[in-house]
Amino acid sequence: MSQAALNTRNSEEEVSSRRNNGTRLAGILFLLTVLTTVLVSGWGVLGWMEDAQRLPLSKLVLTGERHYTRNDDIRQSILALGEPGTFMTQDVNIIQTQIEQRLPWIKQVSVRKQWPDELKIHLVEYVPIARWNDQHMVDAEGNTFSVPPDRTSKQVLPMLYGPEGSANEVLQGYREMGQMLAKDRFTLKEAAMTARRSWQLTLNNDIKLNLGRGDTMKRLARFVELYPVLQQQAQTDGKRISYVDLRYDSGAAVGWAPLPPEESTQQQNQAQAEQQ
């Protein structure tokens, strides 16, 4: 091979080597540029997401049927946790627990976030069927809970009383005795059970029944049987039935009270009309 050909070949190899080195270097530089861009962008996005000034949870949407819960109840519950977080950082489970603990009349609450700045809260309240020991309420499942008095003052509900932890037992007795009385158009206004399981009832006409312990349904049936006779005697004497004590094997002890003035006048007018 001639010297000229050899020189030409070496020159081509040098050019090719320079090109390969240049390409490799360009590839490395490009990769480093991409990685740097990704890292910087990722850091920037993370900071942007955590920046409460960029994505604050500033809108509150409440759903669900509400009778006792006010918007401010929920707002104050959330604010008690401190400054609201961002869409990405706020833990909805913490808000849910906070509402359940601060608002005892809430049966169920679900909290979720909606992009970009909305907090949606769905509430389910307990539905009371009676008042329990004056300070609380009880629902159909025997759950007791409290509601601010000013929000329940207009509700007319039966009154139930019993030892602590006996709400289910009292509620069951109230239902059973109420169903029996309803057949004769009586309504239970109040039912109370003592720690010794002794029962006292108050009817819608304010007659008090003392049933004592045991055989409550049998004693209640005795009252229903005696009532027409007692009512007739009350009208004859111009009095009203105050209480009926049924803690006997048979019969009952009856307490009488004067008629209210308006009822007494009405009864006198009715008697005079019948005589004319």
Curated annotation (Swiss-Prot):
Residues 55-126 form the POTRA domain. Gene3D superfamilies: Cell division protein FtsQ/DivIB, membrane protein fhac. Residues 49-276 are periplasmic. Keywords: Cell cycle, Cell division, Cell inner membrane, Cell membrane, Membrane, Transmembrane, Transmembrane helix. One of its GO terms (cellular component) is cell division site. Signal peptide: none annotated. It is a single-pass type II membrane protein. It is found in: Cell inner membrane. GO terms for biological process: cell septum assembly; FtsZ-dependent cytokinesis. Residues 1-27 are cytoplasmic. Essential cell division protein. May link together the upstream cell division proteins, which are predominantly cytoplasmic, with the downstream cell division proteins, which are predominantly periplasmic. May control correct divisome assembly. Part of a complex composed of FtsB, FtsL and FtsQ. HAMAP family: FtsQ_subfam (MF_00911). This is Cell division protein FtsQ. The lineage of its organism: Bacteria, Pseudomonadati, Pseudomonadota, Gammaproteobacteria, Enterobacterales. The gene is ftsQ.
